Amino acid sequence: MASFAQAAKSLLLKEFVGAFFLSMRQFFAPKATLNYPHEKGPVSPRFRGEHALRRYPNGEERCIACKLCEAICPAQAITIEAGPRRNDGTRRTVRYDIDMVKCIYCGFCQEACPVDAIVEGPNFEFATETREELYYDKDKLLANGDRWEREIARNIAMDAPYR
């Protein structure tokens, strides 16, 4: 009896017909791909992309040179040199470098920062041709912050209830 069922299946090509209809159903289903350079998919507010240093609304940089991000970085990709204390008792950085080749995009630096100075922004398109371009200095980080400030502020505001 089992051999009869086996012969009937092979004679009627049950597996072939089932696979054919499955293929046809997928062929006519709506496409799930994007035309990437021209269309970009949605990015989560918690997305960890290119690093940026933020400024206060008055234009002053937020980083207070506490060096918590440098201490917590597991890849040791951040280097900070603090300047002398100012008249009001605060400090600012003289040098703030991130080696993006070493960075593992864990987000610990962003979590450790008490003033939300260092953030990982929404930009994921920062490929370079040389390794030297992946060594970000303070000017490059501040420029990233200025360029992406609106999106960064929106993402931080959306994520605020969960912090």
Swiss-Prot record:
Membrane topology qualifier: Peripheral membrane protein
Binding site for [4Fe-4S] cluster 2: C73, C103, C106, C109
GO biological process per UniProt: aerobic respiration
GO cellular component, one term: plasma membrane
Alphabetized Gene3D superfamilies for the sequence: 3.30.70.3270
Key words of the record: 4Fe-4S, Cell inner membrane, Cell membrane, Iron, Iron-sulfur, Membrane, Metal-binding, NAD, Quinone, Repeat, Translocase, Ubiquinone
Cofactor(s) required for function per UniProt: [4Fe-4S] cluster
Membership in a protein family: Belongs to the complex I 23 kDa subunit family.
Annotated protein name in UniProt: NADH-quinone oxidoreductase subunit I
Natural source organism: Brucella anthropi (strain ATCC 49188 / DSM 6882 / CCUG 24695 / JCM 21032 / LMG 3331 / NBRC 15819 / NCTC 12168 / Alc 37)
Encoding gene per record: nuoI
